[in-house]
């Protein structure tokens, strides 16, 4: 995995989020919670990566685009296409769930998007103990090592 991914993750440290939607705190803490929930729910390292990097666009605000679009653009070429797609669409089921399900019904990744949405919504604890960024990175590195596939 490209070391640039770790930099994108660490850039979330201290990125404030609206307390109404994110009582847990900054974007890094939230992303680590989503990652931990994903790890408990699946052995799929691509879904772990989508969980960990779903909000990386929040560290690079853009007046023209939303954080899901910015994040997907940042991840393009660094992670598999499936991860980019999940990051790009991770808010679709929040914004317009029925429309998103219709639009993506033929996509084989829709069930993964549903899971990512659930994990994202569940990761709101201000007291959760999380994996450290370095440990999350190491787990992804290990799972993406061809010897572990």
Region locations from a protein language model:
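Generic structural signal of hydrophobic/aromatic residues within well-ordered alpha-helices
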Residues: 5-12, 103, 112-113, 136, ...
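Alpha-helix initiation and N-capping motif
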Residues: 2-6, 46, 80, 109-110, ...
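Short secondary-structure junctions and interdomain/linker hinges
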Residues: 12, 16-19, 41, 45, ...
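Acidic/His-rich, divalent-metal-binding segments that scaffold phosphate/diphosphate chemistry
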Residues: 1-63
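Divalent metal-dependent catalytic cores for phosphoryl transfer on phosphate-bearing substrates
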Residues: 37-125
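Charged substrate- and nucleic-acid-binding regions of tRNA-handling and nucleotidyl-transfer enzymes
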Residues: 110-149
């Amino acid at each position: 995995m490209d070391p640039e991914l770790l930099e994108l993750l660490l850039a979330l440290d201290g990125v404030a989020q609206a307390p109404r939607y994110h009582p847990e705190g900054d974007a890094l803490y939230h992303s680590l919670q989503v990652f931990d929930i994903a790890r408990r729910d699946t052995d799929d390292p691509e879904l772990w990566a989508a969980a960990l990097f779903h909000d990386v666009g929040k560290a690079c605000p853009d007046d023209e685009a939303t954080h899901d679009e910015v994040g997907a653009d940042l991840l393009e070429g660094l992670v598999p296409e499936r991860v980019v797609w999940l990051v790009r669409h991770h808010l679709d089921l929040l914004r317009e769930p029925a429309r998103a399900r219709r639009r993506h019904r033929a996509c084989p990744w829709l069930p993964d998007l549903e899971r990512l949405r659930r994990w994202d919504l569940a990761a709101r604890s201000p007291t959760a103990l999380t994996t450290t960024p370095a440990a999350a990175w190491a787990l992804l590195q290990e799972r993406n090592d061809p010897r572990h596939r």
